[in-house]
């Protein structure tokens, strides 16, 4: 079927392809479908009040956490989980089946062909991509560009979806979106209307925002979640070695939530991270810095990108860790129109 217009008169994003809509409907099962399996509608409402809107999301919770929901006994939880299992395939599958499932992955262009090539096509859905580096290394500029490119149709290497942006440092600028949208030939106001934004002030606020996001993602076609930066509030709210263990535990819980969102709704999760001094880096290493967050963040992020400054407005991206990408570097440039290929 031929693609339809991307935006309605009201500026809201329209899904471009009818076949794509059918694919998206198969990505997750609504929690309301439990009613057809004999679950009381009141119990389904309790799950929704707790931030659980899909059967996929339900199966990502332990029974212990589900019994913590007011009004749900162990017997009810067992019955609910049994009903959800009937709607989903949660067991082993073959590698061939997984390969077919991986075809649902969408790769969103960064705006730079060189960077896209390095990333195997762009920022992937179904996983967390972390970008770390010093200030002015291009992390937030890449985030702004992705806010626009995500809304491009699939055939233009976009995500054909909306964007959720959690800002912990107050660096998001809507006026920055305007020239980037113009570069891609898109209506700036319509693009901004399809970005939902929240400013987080504590790590608890940051986590609660993620819980509330599930309701929106279950109802609307989101394709990207940005957290800029993921570690900033944890470094402020927890200080000293005495609170390090608790900080890492809370950070792990939040990263687990991000992973579940990525897999539950087939969205790309792009997080930025700060760097800290690495006194044990060695005497032959000139740049003694490493990403903050320790092993907890290192294991949670599927793809880790190290950004650094180059000449002038040029930036260099290096694959720091990725399960499916070879080591390599790409040079890109920060312009008024966002991230682009570097000019010699």
Curated annotation (Swiss-Prot):
Binding site for ATP: 133-140
Main location: nucleus
Keyword Transmembrane helix carried by entry: no
Compartments reported by the entry: Nucleus
Gene3D superfamilies, A to Z: 5' to 3' exonuclease, C-terminal subdomain, P-loop containing nucleotide triphosphate hydrolases
Keywords assigned: ATP-binding, Cell cycle, DNA-binding, Meiosis, Nucleotide-binding, Nucleus
Keyword Nucleus among UniProt keywords: yes
Top-rank taxon, per record: Eukaryota
Binding site for ssDNA: 235, 238, 241, 247, 315
Stored InterPro entries: Dmc1 (IPR011940), DNA_recomb/repair_Rad51_C (IPR013632), DNA_recomb/repair_RecA-like (IPR016467), DNA_repair_Rad51/TF_NusA_a-hlx (IPR010995), P-loop_NTPase (IPR027417), RecA_ATP-bd (IPR020588), RecA_monomer-monomer_interface (IPR020587)
Record GO biological process: chromosome organization involved in meiotic cell cycle; DNA recombinase assembly; DNA strand invasion; mitotic recombination; reciprocal meiotic recombination
CDD domains for this protein: DMC1
A Gene Ontology molecular function term of the record: ATP binding
Tissue expression remark: Expressed in pollen mother cells and root tips.
Comment field (misc): Plant silencing DMC1A are sterile due to defects in homologous pairing and subsequent chromosome segregation during male meiosis.
Its biological purpose: Recombinase that may participate in meiotic recombination, specifically in homologous strand assimilation, which is required for the resolution of meiotic double-strand breaks. Exhibits DNA-dependent ATPase activity when bound to single-stranded DNA (ssDNA). Mediates renaturation of homologous complementary strands as well as assimilation of single strands into homologous supercoiled duplexes leading to D-loop formation. Binds circular single-stranded DNA (ssDNA) and circular double-stranded DNA (dsDNA) in vitro. Catalyzes DNA homologous renaturation and DNA strand exchange.
Protein name: Meiotic recombination protein DMC1 homolog A
Species of origin: Oryza sativa subsp. indica (Rice)
Organism placement in taxonomy: Eukaryota, Viridiplantae, Streptophyta, Embryophyta, Tracheophyta
Name of the gene this protein is made from: DMC1A
């Amino acid at each position: 079927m031929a693609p339809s217009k991307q935006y309605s008169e009201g500026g809201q994003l329209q899904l471009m392809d009818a076949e794509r809509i059918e694919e998206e409907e198969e990505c997750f099962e609504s929690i309301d479908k439990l009613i057809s399996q004999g679950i009381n509608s009141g119990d389904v409402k309790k799950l929704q009040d707790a931030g659980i809107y899909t059967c996929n999301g339900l199966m990502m919770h332990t029974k212990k956490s589900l019994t913590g929901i007011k009004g749900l006994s162990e017997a009810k939880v067992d019955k609910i989980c049994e009903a959800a299992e009937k709607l989903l395939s949660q067991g082993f599958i073959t590698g061939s089946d997984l390969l077919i499932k991986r075809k649902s992955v969408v790769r969103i262009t960064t705006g730079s062909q060189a960077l896209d090539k390095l990333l195997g096509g762009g920022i992937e859905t179904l996983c967390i991509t972390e970008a770390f580096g010093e200030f002015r290394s291009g992390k937030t500029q890449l985030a702004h560009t992705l806010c626009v490119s995500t809304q491009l149709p699939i055939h233009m290497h976009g995500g054909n979806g909306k964007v959720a942006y959690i800002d912990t440092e107050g660096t998001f600028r809507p006026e920055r979106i305007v020239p980037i949208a113009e570069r891609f030939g898109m209506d700036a106001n319509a693009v901004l209307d399809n970005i939902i934004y929240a400013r987080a002030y504590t790590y608890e606020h940051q986590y609660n925002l993620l819980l509330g996001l599930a309701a929106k993602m279950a109802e609307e076609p989101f394709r990207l979640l940005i957290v800029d930066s993921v570690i900033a509030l944890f470094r402020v709210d927890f200080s000293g070695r005495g609170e390090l263990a608790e900080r890492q535990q809370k950070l792990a819980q939040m990263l687990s939530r991000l992973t579940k969102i990525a897999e539950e709704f087939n969205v790309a999760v792009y997080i930025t991270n700060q760097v800290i001094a690495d006194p044990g880096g060695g005497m032959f290493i000139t740049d003694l810095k490493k990403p903050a967050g320790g092993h907890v963040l290192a294991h949670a992020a599927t793809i880790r990108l190290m950004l650094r400054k180059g000449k002038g407005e040029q930036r260099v991206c290096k694959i720091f860790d990725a399960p499916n990408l070879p080591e390599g570097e790409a040079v890109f440039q920060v312009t008024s129109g966002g991230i682009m290929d570097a000019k010699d």
